[in-house]
Structures are given as structure tokens and as C-alpha cells.
Amino acid sequence: MEVSIFLRKIKEIIKEDPSKLDWIPTKKNRRTRQELGLSLQDIEDSIITLEANDIFRGPEIDRDIPDEILYIFKKNLESQIIYIKLKLRDNKIVVCLSFHIDEE
């Protein structure tokens, strides 16, 4: 799926029902959230404001779940570059696998 179509779809899903955003609380994600003082609403807002030119990589196949496609973005937030990895599950759940300070 083209990145602009992917973004339009995930934004519609999140705006319609924010509970459809599944933020995965990995150690890196939790650390970034704590260091930057981010709420889940801040993370949601950052995802909602992503643009096609924020794409870093993708679409690419998820190595853990080959039926799912990943999109990786980088976005400036709180003077940091944030690495954001998203996918759409079953066309109805937005999964945020990564939302952490970029390590590259």
C-alpha cells in the first residue's frame, strides 16, 4: 500500500476510535515516553500528524508476522528524532511497534 494511503487509513481509524491504536510498551518505547514526558495522547497526536515525507523505510514485510506490512517513519519531536514503526492489523487496528528516540 502506498504510504499516503496507509497514513490516510490509520488516521481515519485512530480518529474514529483511539482505542484502535495499539502502542507496544517495549523498554525503548517506555524509556522515550518517560524521558520526554509523553502521554499516550502525545504519541497518538504525533502519529496523526505524520506525513508521507516522514517515511524512512517501507512498505516492507514484517519479519515476525510475514502477512503484515511495516512502515517506518522518523519525525522531529521535543528536539529529538523519533523512530516510529507502524503497521495495520486486519485493516482495523493500528499497531505502533516502535516510538523511541532514533539510534542512528
Spans of model-derived segments:
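N-terminal intrinsically disordered, low-complexity regulatory regions
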Residues: M1-E2
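Functionally constrained cores in energy, signaling, and assembly domains
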Residues: N29, R33, K75, C96
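Enriched for short, Lys/Arg-rich terminal
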Residues: I81-Y83, K87-E104
